[in-house]
Curated annotation (Swiss-Prot):
Signal sequence segment: none
UniProt keyword annotation of Transcription present: no
Coiled-coil intervals: 229-467, 511-580
Gene: ccdc93
Keyword entries, A-Z: Coiled coil, Endosome, Protein transport, Transport
Protein's GO biological process: protein transport
Pfam families, per the entry: CCDC93_CC, CCDC93_N
PANTHER family given in the database record: COILED-COIL DOMAIN-CONTAINING PROTEIN 93 (PTHR16441:SF0), FIDIPIDINE (PTHR16441)
Protein name: Coiled-coil domain-containing protein 93
Length: 610
């Protein structure tokens, strides 16, 4: 048990792998931006814990730590700090587990994955914050300022919008034809849609003003599976004829909008002229009929393109049907393969989990074997080997006994058969029974001996388990040191509470005295002011009270100065002890280095001379 006021040293693993991991951790922290890890005067614990705290705060997570750096912390303070760090890691969804004693014991092999993950998370958070701050700065800049390109755009915007609206107004859809008032009403929706498109000069997307296509452009690419089929051609011809009749019927019921709007009706002409109304009406109707016939003849030129589109749609529809069937078949095969793949993945995950479980058990057994005492372990191995050999001998003996018993049983059966024939079985039967009893007793003795040996092995194994190993003793020592630190911290805190209580109690007593004095002055003031003698006596009493208060105050000031001097003296002693402690640690380190050099020189001197 370490003496009070001294900082106990914790046993740490100082092998090559731990040193390599520490160097990698420091390189990661420096690369991430934690340059305090370069300071050579800091201990590895301060560098690692400081780097972890810096990464956690960079990731915008709160951690309850002391902002003021304190060198040579006690075991209790280190445990409290590591527990706070470990409690924050699950909140950050860290995939690696870490215990406080691993950080305190400087187990860099287990600390390295956590540091690696924290550095990666800190860099990602810093990049996200940089992007956010950059976008926020750009938005604030655009709110207050504008670029020359934006100013030019605002100047040209109004003119551009006006030009665009005029262009849209010029090229907007215009009605070129209109159904006549006396035409029959269309019943189905497709005919109404087709009629409306024809009124605006469009036939399935082809404008009236477009030039007729060339014969080679009108050729429809026929799929490979439809070449040379007469039924498709006949169907296309029928569709073409039906479409031509349909368009012709629709166009005969329409008239040009400009002609109809510019035409004067018979009633209007009669009202204006007042004579020959019938002749004018007849001429106007004849003119309208001629105009409709001419417009119908003009539209006949564009019927071929629509029928060609119909044929293309029919051929492509059949090709789409074939492709859909093929797609359904491929989807069924894909679903079957997907289900098989899912089962295979499930089996793979089961096998992988089983392998991981076996690896974990094997690593636990290897760890236990490395921590155990070599001599006790070798003795236990010898006993286990002896037990295994005895078991093997028992199995061999049992197999031999079974073979011997079967052979003897065969002999008995043969002898019984021979005895029944010759009548000489009694003596042989008795001899065999005696031999059987002897072998049975021998087997029972061997079983008792084996049970006694197994019991001795179990007793020795329990005794071995009761003896603590070196690792367990080290763990007990660490725990006792931690408990001592916690007890000392609790004692210090309790002492502070007692001091605070005594201070507050003294303050309460002085306040009560002050209140009683003020109440007494208030009660006797009127009576003392009634006569001069009473007033003089009252003033003398007040002067005596003030003198007493001054004396008490001087005593307290003197006591305060004494305590302050004592505190300064203790602080100086504490600083001297700290300096001695630093010198002690430095001397121990130099002594270890000299011992290492001495061992190196001795090993070189003992080496074989050439």
């Amino acid at each position: 048990m370490a003496a009070r006021g001294e900082t106990p040293e914790v046993e740490t693993r100082e092998d090559e792998e731990q040193g390599v991991k520490l160097a990698e951790i420091l390189e990661l922290l420096v690369a991430a931006g934690y340059f305090r890890a370069r300071i050579k005067g800091l201990s590895p614990f301060d560098k690692v814990v400081g780097g972890m705290t810096w990464c956690i705060t960079t990731c915008n997570f709160d951690i309850d730590v002391d902002l003021l750096f304190q060198e040579n912390s006690t075991i209790g303070q280190k445990i409290a700090l590591t527990e706070k760090i470990v409690s924050v890691l699950p909140k950050m969804k860290c995939p690696h587990r870490l215990e406080p004693h691993q950080i305190q014991g400087l187990d860099f092999i287990h600390i390295f994955p956590v540091i690696q993950w924290l550095v990666k998370r800190a860099i990602e958070t810093r990049q996200e914050m940089g992007d956010y701050i950059r976008s926020y700065s750009v938005s604030q800049f655009h709110k207050e300022h504008s670029l020359p390109e934006d100013q030019d755009f605002e100047l040209r915007r109004e003119k551009t919008v006006r030009t665009l609206s005029e262009t849209l107004d010029v090229y907007r859809p215009r009605r070129k034809y209109k159904r006549q008032g006396g035409s029959s009403e269309l019943m189905d929706e497709e005919s109404r849609v087709h009629s409306t498109l024809l009124e605006y000069g469009r036939r399935y997307g082809l404008s009236k003003q477009m030039k007729p296509e060339k014969p080679e452009d009108r050729r429809v690419p026929v799929p490979q599976g439809l070449v040379g089929k007469g039924e498709v051609r006949e169907e296309e011809e029928e569709l073409r004829a039906e479409e031509e009749l349909r368009i012709k019927a629709l166009m005969t019921e329409m008239a040009a909008t400009g002609m109809e709007e510019g035409r004067l009706t018979a009633s209007t002409v009669g009202q204006i002229v007042g004579l020959q109304s019938k002749e004018i009406k007849q001429m106007v109707s004849e003119y309208a009929e001629k105009q409709s016939e001419l417009s119908a003849e003009d539209r006949a030129e564009y019927l071929g393109a629509a029928q060609q589109h119909r044929r293309k749609v029919a051929s492509l529809s059949k090709l789409i049907g074939q492709r859909k069937k093929l797609l359904d078949q491929l989807q069924e095969k894909a679903s079957e393969l997907q289900s098989g793949c899912g089962e295979t993945r499930k089996q793979l995950t089961e096998v992988t989990s089983h392998m991981e479980k076996l690896d974990q058990e094997l690593s636990v057994l290897e760890n236990m074997e490395s921590k155990a005492d070599p001599s006790v372990l070798q003795k236990l191995r010898d006993l286990v080997a002896q037990n295994e050999s005895l078991k093997a001998q028992e199995q061999q003996f049992r197999s031999k006994c079974r073979e011997e018993m079967s052979r003897l049983q065969q002999n008995i059966d043969g002898l019984k058969a021979a005895a029944t024939e010759h009548g000489e079985e009694k003596e042989q039967t008795q001899a065999f029974e005696q031999q059987y009893k002897a072998e049975r007793e021998k087997l029972q003795k061997i079983r008792l001996l084996l049970a006694r040996r197994n019991r001795e092995i179990a007793i020795l194994q329990r005794k071995i388990d009761e003896v603590p190993s070196r690792a367990e003793l080290t763990q007990y020592q660490k725990r006792f040191i931690e408990l001592y630190g916690q007890v000392s911290a609790t004692h210090k805190e309790t002492k502070q509470f007692f001091t605070l209580y005594n201070t507050l109690d003294d303050k309460k007593v002085y306040l009560e005295k002050e209140v009683n004095l003020l109440n007494s002055i208030h009660d006797n003031f009127q009576q003392a002011m009634a006569s001069p003698s009473a007033r003089d006596q009252f003033l003398r009493q007040m002067e005596q009270i003030v003198d007493g208060i001054r004396q008490s105050r001087n005593k307290m000031e003197k006591k305060k100065q004494e305590n302050k001097m004592k505190r300064d003296q203790l602080n100086d002693e504490y600083l001297e002890l700290l300096e001695k402690q630093r010198l002690y640690f430095k001397t121990v380190k130099e002594f270890k280095e000299e011992c290492r050099k001495n061992e190196t020189l001795l090993s070189k001197m003992k080496g074989p001379t050439p």
